[in-house]
Amino acid sequence: MLAPKKQKFRKAHKGRVASTAKAGTTLAFGSFGLKSIDGWRVTARQIEAGRKAATRCMKRQGRLWIRIFPDVPVSQKPAEVRMGKGKGSPEFFAVRVSPGRIMFEIEGVEENVALRALELASAKLPVRTRIVRRYE
């Protein structure tokens, strides 16, 4: 799974997702991409599940790029623990995805295979998405 090698701080604020993405809104590598419509927090496990679903559909043909990286530590308190007594320990990493952000890109497979792979990947993500093409 994706995780940063080093962090400046162990714990992060919950934060909010910014209005719309300022960067990463156009296709940079592939011919087809998966663009977010909503703003939400996507975990490293969800990114990995989307990657596995897409590559399995592509049958290891072509190339897949992941354009987002989980760099925000998310902390949780253990189950059945009362409120207070400090913040919980970091459990996993996530990325705050803004609306309009390209998350996955595909190149080197037929159009119907690429569209199916991106549909399967989008089913694993908590955000609403749309598929974009290079010539749009």
UniProtKB/Swiss-Prot annotation:
Keyword Ribonucleoprotein found: yes
Keywords: Ribonucleoprotein, Ribosomal protein, RNA-binding, rRNA-binding, tRNA-binding
InterPro entries for the chain: Ribosomal_uL16, Ribosomal_uL16_bact-type, Ribosomal_uL16_CS, Ribosomal_uL16_dom, Ribosomal_uL16_sf
Keyword tRNA-binding in annotation: yes
Pfam families: Ribosomal_L16 (PF00252)
Classification via SUPFAM superfamilies: Ribosomal protein L16p/L10e
GO terms of biological process kind: translation
Source organism, top-level taxon: Bacteria
Single annotated GO MF: structural constituent of ribosome
A Gene Ontology cellular-component term: cytosolic large ribosomal subunit
Family per record: Belongs to the universal ribosomal protein uL16 family.
Quaternary structure, from the entry: Part of the 50S ribosomal subunit.
Its biological purpose: Binds 23S rRNA and is also seen to make contacts with the A and possibly P site tRNAs.
Name the record gives this protein: Large ribosomal subunit protein uL16
Organism whose genome encodes this protein: Rickettsia rickettsii (strain Sheila Smith)
